[in-house]
Amino acid sequence: MNLKKLKNKLFRRPGQRAVIAVPYIWLLVLFLIPFAIVLKISFAEQEIAIPPFTPLTSVDEDLGRLNIAISYQNYADIFQNFWNTLNPFGDSENSNIYLMTYWSSIKTALTTTIICLLIGYPTAYAISRANLAMRNGLLLAIMLPFWTSFLLRVYAWMGLLGHNGIINNFLLKMQIIEEPLDLFYNAFSLNLVMVYAYLPFMILPLYTQLVKLDNRLLEAASDLGAGPIKSFFTITLPLSKTGIIAGSMLVFVPAVGEFVIPELVGGSENLMIGKVLWQ
């Protein structure tokens, strides 16, 4: 590479530099700066005031010097409570509620991701194999819930699953049950609404990957004697791995920090870290 080409690569036009700078500015403003603020608070001491933590630095006007007060007590409490949580002979009453709820959040998010994958994969596969008109209609049906408020959709489930909701009233009128079922404020309702809310985020990445699958590969596998199941595990599934990873990340990451659904339909026994931090 000659000097001129190297110079052109290092000193691009201002427009190109501006375009490249946009994602870095986005990360700086929305991730690095908030992370730095939280990191600063973690080294402060708690107090009943506004803001509810002590400043890390203060100026002594009499002596004219800068005082730095860094506390490691928050980190000591984390490790101590973490040990109490894991130790079967430890003080379970002092176990850190944040660690327990974070573990509960991971389990709930993992369950949601697995169920979304099991439902979303065949759905995305069926959409990708439909004709163009049917495909557009099915994609519209997947996107249709996003046209309404997320909060309204959660409230709709409250009307369906509640003690006096539509499902219980229907079953009582049909004399299928004698008393209303406990469909609300439990793990069942939490997982059900979580799957409903995040299922489109699994289907769409899978669809974009499966729709690009070359049918000639499946035809060649069939000509060589491979059955549908073997063709799926040797061709379709490996080629859709990127969509599986993308969909799983889009579901798992926001599901861990979800607080609206646990607050409205999860009840007091199904705590998640987003709900605890919000409260």
PLM features: residue spans?
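Interhelical loop and adjacent transmembrane-helix boundary motif
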Residues: F11-Q16, A49, V59-D62, Y72-F82, ...
